[in-house]
């Protein structure tokens, strides 16, 4: 939701923010 990181939750925008 901040910067483009690795798509953990399938979303590149919620990468490091939405870790499973």
Swiss-Prot record:
It is a multi-pass membrane protein. It comes from the Bacteria. GO terms for biological process: photosynthesis. Keywords: Membrane, Photosynthesis, Photosystem I, Thylakoid, Transmembrane. Residues 1-20 are annotated as: Disordered. It is found in: Cellular thylakoid membrane. One of its GO terms (cellular component) is plasma membrane-derived thylakoid membrane. Its main location: membrane. Belongs to the PsaL family. This is Photosystem I reaction center subunit XI. It comes from Thermostichus vulcanus (Synechococcus vulcanus).
């Amino acid at each position: 939701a901040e910067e483009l990181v690795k798509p953990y939750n399938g979303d590149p925008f919620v990468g490091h923010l939405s870790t499973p």
